[in-house]
Amino acid sequence: MSCFLSCVRFETTTDNNKPTSTESGSVSGVTCYTWDDVESLTSNFSRLIGTGGYSSIYLARVSGSINAALKVHVSSHRLYQVFRSELEILLRLQHPHIVKLLGYFDDSEESGALLLEYLPQGNLQEKLNRNSKQVLPWRNRTAIAFQVAQAIEHIHEKCSPQIVHGDIKSSNILLDKHFNSKLCDFGSAKVGFSSMVQPSKTTSTMSPRSKQVMMIGSPGYTDPHYLRTGIASKKMDMYGFGVVVLELVSGKEAVSSERGEMLVHSTASLIHEILDSNGDIGEEKVRQFLDPRLSRDGSIDLEEVKTMLRVAAFCLRSPPSLRPSASQVVQTLNKKIPSLSFLGCGKKE
């Protein structure tokens, strides 16, 4: 059975592999691997370390000592098109808060592989999990929000053609050893429009299962407007970002693993109060919503928490046209969150 690999994450920053070729116009230094290289990296796919959905994840080694994880999908034409789309997007992207493409394999038929940098702290969802031994400090949470907003601003407003990510969520935000964030997984991304894209005209003739496969986004993060209309837009990304900010402030999951309740539903009254009062909210309610694991940190500025909640609330507004752009969010956080000063020169893109 043929297969393709969609993700390789490297553990160190050094790599002795020299680029063998790159696509015309692509980011320099991206290595093109052969399928023999891919098999060698995984020792012929001998070390399975995880599975999920349509994929299996194998342990791999690069240059004999650098650990990597390879995410392998059962091959199909549809999955190959997803791979090709993500490859073409990543070859064009170069930003400090977007995961870096280091290499790829593509046989131009049904097999392909993306080699991406490894970030040792895992993803944001794992770090916010209340079972995590390490509590993510407040200033790191504000920095993550700011950096992700910068990444979204880059793909929305500084790329040509512009890009809609399509699946902004905490598990698609990776963290390096200093807890700087990088946006990953562009498999759902849409390219070539400034604000929105209509679904294919052939959608109405497809089976319910086919329609389901075409849907993008994840439970708890997906814009209700997209679910109603099938129109993916930049404002859809801002909705997902708003949910991530709620997670950062509260430490709660986008969808409760215990009750199955969505965070946007359990916080609806708070969001409405913020919007109805033009952003004004009492300190007691702010304290009640703040992650209780942060309550021992007396240095937290509640005005910063209020700013984060305002940003989240405005990103969740309906209709989507009322939501801020990524640039507006970057400007607001830059101006209203003093704790971002610890980022120094990294505060600016």
UniProtKB/Swiss-Prot annotation:
Residues modified as Phosphoserine: 171, 210
Q: Which PROSITE patterns match?
A: PROTEIN_KINASE_ATP, PROTEIN_KINASE_DOM, PROTEIN_KINASE_ST
The enzyme's E.C. designation: 2.7.11.1
Identify residues that carry Phosphotyrosine: 226
Regions crossing the membrane: none
- SMART domains in the record, alphabetically? S_TKc
Where's the active site on this chain? Answer: 167 (proton acceptor)
Q: Does the keyword Nucleotide-binding apply?
A: yes
Indicate whether Disulfide bond appears among the record's keywords.
Answer: no
User: Which amino acid positions bind ATP, per UniProt?
Assistant: 49-57, 71
What Gene3D superfamilies does the database record attribute to this sequence? Phosphorylase Kinase, domain 1, Transferase(Phosphotransferase) domain 1
Q: What class of enzyme is it?
A: transferase
What residues bear Phosphothreonine in this entry?
34
Q: Which reaction does this chain catalyze?
A: L-seryl-[protein] + ATP = O-phospho-L-seryl-[protein] + ADP + H(+); L-threonyl-[protein] + ATP = O-phospho-L-threonyl-[protein] + ADP + H(+)
Q: Where is the Protein kinase domain?
A: 43-343
**Gene Ontology molecular function:** ATP binding; protein serine kinase activity; protein serine/threonine kinase activity
Write the record's keywords in alphabetical order, separated by commas: ATP-binding, Kinase, Nucleotide-binding, Phosphoprotein, Serine/threonine-protein kinase, Transferase
- Pfam families for the chain: Pkinase (PF00069)
**In which family does this protein belong, per the annotation?**
Belongs to the protein kinase superfamily. Ser/Thr protein kinase family.
Q: What is this protein called?
A: Probable receptor-like protein kinase At1g33260
Q: Which organism is it from?
A: Arabidopsis thaliana (Mouse-ear cress)
